[in-house]
From Swiss-Prot:
The lineage of its organism: Bacteria, Bacillati, Bacillota, Bacilli, Bacillales. GO terms for cellular component: cytoplasm. It comes from Bacillus cereus (strain AH187). The gene is cysH. The keyword Protein transport does not apply. This is Adenosine 5'-phosphosulfate reductase. CDD domains: PAPS_reductase. It is an enzyme of class 1 (oxidoreductase).
Amino acid sequence: MLTYETWEENDVSFSEEDETKGALSVLSWAYKEYENEIVYACSFGVEGMVLLHLINQVNPSAKVVFLDTNVHFQETYELIQKVRERFPSLNIIEKQPKLTLDEQAKLHGNKLWESNPNLCCKIRKILPLEESLANEKAWISGLRREQSETRKHTKFINQDHRFQSIKVCPLIHWTWKEVWRYVYKHSLPYNPLHDIGYPSIGCEKCTLPVGEGGDSRDGRWAGKVKTECGLHYQ
């Protein structure tokens, strides 16, 4: 089994005719390699809808973890319910932070997402994912190379130094148009915020719509240098 400690470069080839651009092949490899020791960390963005559909074909009872920061858009929570109805066999876990919002405010002040967004992300996303990955050998992410400069070198199979794990990224070669083409083709549910200018959807407090021609991550932590929550630093 390929683990963080036994890391060696791996790649997956795929034919030009493969509609999934290697995604199904990568997922098949991953679930064969790790069986029940792999989890998909899903934010329920549009890429997530594609991956959930693909994962359901490979392993209908796969584990899926959603990092519930308690400050997501209502539309996101409603989408999760639709996904549960569409893919009832998937094991969707809504992982909560150790601190409630009130407890966080007492310790660090109100609106920590404004005063110290890095700490807020650590408390409400990074630490919960660490806990979720503690008993796993690998995890799956919906990163695409096209999304931003920080993601353009992502590979199918990555040694993840942040969580000392293996990170599997099946959609690295997909474009934004291909993601949506797949969603429409298979009539997949998606977050309606995508229709009003939100290409990337995170917490409600830190996500704004993006103007035409903007980077898909421009709406995240707008006005700050921060462009990543910290889950995907290598």
